[in-house]
Amino acid sequence: MTTETRSLYSQLPAIDRLLHDSSFLSLRDTYGHTRVVELLRQMLDEAREVIRDSQTLPAWCENWAQEVDARLTKEAQSALRPVINLTGTVLHTNLGRALQAEAAVEAVAQAMRSPVTLEYDLDDAGRGHRDRALAQLLCRITGAEDACIVNNNAAAVLLMLAATASGKEVVVSRGELVEIGGAFRIPDVMRQAGCTLHEVGTTNRTHANDYRQAVNENTALLMKVHTSNYSIQGFTKAIDEAELVALGKELDVPVVTDLGSGSLVDLSQYGLPKEPMPQELIAAGVSLVSFSGDKLLGGPQAGIIVGKKEMIARLQSHPLKRALRADKMTLAALEATLRLYLHPEALSEKLPTLRLLTRSAEVIQIQAQRLQAPLAAHYGAEFAVQVMPCLSQIGSGSLPVDRLPSAALTFTPHDGRGSHLESLAARWRELPVPVIGRIYDGRLWLDLRCLEDEQRFLEMLLK
């Protein structure tokens, strides 16, 4: 060991001396004595390694308290951090899909703070059913006879098939054998549920007679799957639920439908493309309809099944139901969200998903123009900051071919180097509330459709 190396090692402080320094008192109060000591030991090991490899001290050795504070602050951040979603995808799966209404947030907080009547009947002091209140709401909204709640729509489809068709065949059009992401495919779900898939028709055309010819003594269900995350266009043919229900009645085979996204309102009244609604399928005579809680419905992640009472009873009594049931927080948020649908006149104001989807391009354009000047002044030395028209997408496999006119702020590096865009995007991801955009066509795009806290956004980007 050289004299210089020995000198560097001697400059490393003792942990006891650091802990008695006044700058460490607040750190010990905030993070605890044990964690601070653990980190100091780790940092001393790091410093010794740097000395050994490069014959120098790490820069942070000049201020140990500051480095400890920075590391522990970062460590204490939640893994689920709030972000500003300016990707242009409203229901972004990686960013948690639907934002919850304030009523849902308050309901969850209340359910977390105190015991609740999850499975307790106040009328007779007996045991209640956790789905009962929600089932009543869902029946009122959809016209169904009963309802069942599980933790997501994939679980809903699994339970629906396992409880009503295990060991038997389920007839599905080949054009509806969807994959919803993460290699989750309808044929795979059927195998897990113990069903046998009976494909009919072709990818682009399926006729009523295809279903008729497929039905045999081992057929349990005729199934429709809404292709919510893709669209087959051109020379196509598919039969709707009403026609399939009529055929099912003739052949004494129930019809079930997986709607996927599942909107409880006619979106066309808000200027959006229309999606099939559970209440329409219930009115058509479909026995069971499954859909998601956290997509177009705008609530928490949940799988909802509505339909005929005797069919729902089979789902409720199946062993999988307990494994897949929703917890009290999910049920609280979903109930509060569904209650908003009882006042449809205020829905676009109180339901964040609908509020964001229905923002007009003109309003977003005005917002973009308002923000452009201060951002151009701040970033203009390196980037051209412009207002550009763009198209938002709904996301989460909803309305896959439909786009919503919007406006974006774009940042284009003067030197054209893509590395500058990556650096800017990385810098914004390190903000107290990370700002998430997307890099495309030599620009960093910030689609403003989902920007509601404009002041906080500006304060962070102008620092």
Curated annotation (Swiss-Prot):
Among InterPro entries, the record links this protein to: PyrdxlP-dep_Trfase, PyrdxlP-dep_Trfase_major, SelA-like, SelA_trans, SelA_trans_N_dom
Picking any one GO molecular function of the record gives: L-seryl-tRNA(Sec) selenium transferase activity
Mention any Pfam family matching this sequence: Se-cys_synth_N
UniProt KW Protein biosynthesis keyword: yes
Q: What class of enzyme is it?
A: transferase
Q: Does the keyword Zinc apply?
A: no
PTM annotation (N6-(pyridoxal phosphate)lysine): residues: 295
Keywords noted in UniProt: Cytoplasm, Protein biosynthesis, Pyridoxal phosphate, Selenium, Transferase
Give the reactions, separated by semicolons, that this protein catalyses: L-seryl-tRNA(Sec) + selenophosphate + H(+) = L-selenocysteinyl-tRNA(Sec) + phosphate
EC id:
2.9.1.1
Indicate the principal place this protein occupies in or around the cell.
Answer: cytoplasm
Query: What GO biological process terms are annotated to this protein in UniProt?
Result: conversion of seryl-tRNAsec to selenocys-tRNAsec; selenocysteine incorporation
Task: Provide the protein's localization.
Answer: Cytoplasm
Q: Which cofactor is essential here?
A: pyridoxal 5'-phosphate
Pathway, per Swiss-Prot/TrEMBL?
Aminoacyl-tRNA biosynthesis; selenocysteinyl-tRNA(Sec) biosynthesis; selenocysteinyl-tRNA(Sec) from L-seryl-tRNA(Sec) (bacterial route): step 1/1
- Regions that span the bilayer: none
Its family? Answer: Belongs to the SelA family.
What role does this protein play? Answer: Converts seryl-tRNA(Sec) to selenocysteinyl-tRNA(Sec) required for selenoprotein biosynthesis.
Oligomeric form and interacting partners: Homodecamer; pentamer of dimers. Binds only one seryl-tRNA(Sec) per dimer.
- Recorded protein name is L-seryl-tRNA(Sec) selenium transferase
Q: Which organism is it from?
A: Shigella boydii serotype 4 (strain Sb227)
What does the organism's lineage look like at the top?
Answer: Bacteria, Pseudomonadati, Pseudomonadota, Gammaproteobacteria, Enterobacterales
Q: Gene symbol? A: selA
